[in-house]
């Protein structure tokens, strides 16, 4: 159980692919102009990570070490092709918005990296959980960045959600504030870099405060027995 918890915590926070490893920067910065696009690509990446980790882990005993990387790439490309066709069939608007970044998941360092570092060494269930956790960590980072850029740039949230979830999702659109002229800096790649930098700074502050709290707690625990011994 502790190993399962560690895999989840590592994927979502401690080893977040976007905020710690800084992998997959190209789609992270290019697609996160809206929350819908960010969520769509994040979920697609999560599905690919989960399925590829599961498949590669299941076949690891029969995969020759000398040609493992080409085999991994073939498996990843097959899964990405299936996901791309599903998005094309059931979310065509999102498919048009994401464009080339769906097939580019094949070359994403996150997917290949988890296949080599984790799935090739662990069991199928734990590997699938690792892929899901890493994918959801990246999805959360994409979604926060996409929401931030969309709100600052257009004053809206979940604009175009119907392209991902269907026509009923039009009701999810929120106009945070009205603007006649979009804030282009937030919508363009420089705004993505600035937003990502802010997210990295916030994560660093949270981690530092957590370390300080743990250090204070450890000192308090170490001082308490000394006091008891002194009184005795």
UniProtKB/Swiss-Prot annotation:
Origin organism lineage: Bacteria, Pseudomonadati, Pseudomonadota, Gammaproteobacteria, Enterobacterales
Biological process according to GO: electron transport chain
Record-level GO cellular component terms: plasma membrane
Membrane-traversing stretches: 39-59, 69-89, 92-112, 125-145, 182-202
Keywords assigned: Cell inner membrane, Cell membrane, Electron transport, Membrane, Translocase, Transmembrane, Transmembrane helix, Transport
Pfam families per the UniProt record, alphabetical: Rnf-Nqr
InterPro entries in alphabetical order: NqrDE/RnfAE, RnfE
Native source organism of the sequence: Klebsiella pneumoniae (strain 342)
Membrane-protein topology: Multi-pass membrane protein
Family as reported in the entry's similarity comment: Belongs to the NqrDE/RnfAE family.
Name of the top EC class for this enzyme: translocase
Protein name: Ion-translocating oxidoreductase complex subunit E
Subcellular location: Cell inner membrane
Purpose of the protein: Part of a membrane-bound complex that couples electron transfer with translocation of ions across the membrane.
Designated gene of the protein: rnfE
Entry EC number(s): 7.-.-.-
Subunit comment: The complex is composed of six subunits: RnfA, RnfB, RnfC, RnfD, RnfE and RnfG.
